Amino acid sequence: HGAHKNPYRGRNPAWLSGGIERDGFIHWSQPEIVLYDLDPENCSFDAETGLPGEGGGMSYPDLIEQDGSYWITETQKTVARVHPIDSTLLGDLWSQGNVRTVTQKGLILDLARPHLADGEVDLPRLPDLAEGGGLSIDFWIQLEVMSAGQIILDSRNASGEGIVVKTARNGRVRIEMNDGKNSGRWASDREILQPGSWHHVAIIVDGGPNVITFVVDGLLGDGGTTSIYGWGRFSPELSDVTGSEKLRVAPSLLGRLGRLRIYDRYLRTSEAVANFHAGR
């Protein structure tokens, strides 16, 4: 999820995956961000695309377990650090696929059919991303035609402030955010949407590491065969992206939505996976 041709680059953020042994094989979970560095030199990115740059990051990690608690150690030249790891993060990694309930914490909007056909709904104010807040957009979608530019969700005002989620070329979903001064954007991996099929999409915007991830049908985007990264960065100055406080639902969608949930926090990958397994 961050492999760079130069092994000394692309190490921020750091990811953690949990393995479970079954029938002699280790089955690995979808990864979570476990550590990140806010040093600007290690957070470089292309402002036009969101594509991460070549910044460095954590080195030589070790996992320590003692009396049911966990830590990760890491070093940078002459500096060494020890980080306690939230045990619930590890527990969620190991239980991925077994949890099949919808996450309720932070849920501020939950629309099911027929309310998805209302066209426009009130959107509660979203957290300030520049202050470390986050948001997640979680929906089920079935497209009739896979063409770029179909608007799935749109909270933008007349000045362009807000969020828009739309289809993009090569079977992708794209999010664009604007606070009036700063913007951020990222798209899912290619060919993840197939016309006529139901897909679950979770877009996770985390104002801690300033990272956008996509979890589609229970799988965290990793860039596939066409990109080094499956996640993108946005400016640490990007703040309030609520926009008009009205959310237009599927204004130009050639298809239909089966469920829409918006959270006023970032979801863990494991929570997005659980929402997928919970179904529509």
Name every feature range the model reports, one short phrase each.
Residues 1-39:
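Loop/turn-rich, solvent-exposed surfaces of beta-rich toroidal or solenoidal domains
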Residues 1-4, 75-77, 206:
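Short loop/turn segments immediately following the C-termini of beta-strands
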Residues 12, 57-59, 135, 197:
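Beta-rich catalytic cores
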Residues 17-21, 83-85, 215, 263:
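Hydrophobic/aromatic beta-strand positions that recur at structurally equivalent sites within the blades
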Residues 23-66:
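Conserved blade-ending motifs and adjacent loop-strand segments that build the rim/top face
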Residues 26-36, 93-101, 225:
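Beta-propeller fold detector
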Residues 57-107:
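Blade-level signature of beta-propeller repeat domains, shared across WD40, Kelch, NHL, RCC1
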Residues 102-280:
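Extracellular glycan-associated modules
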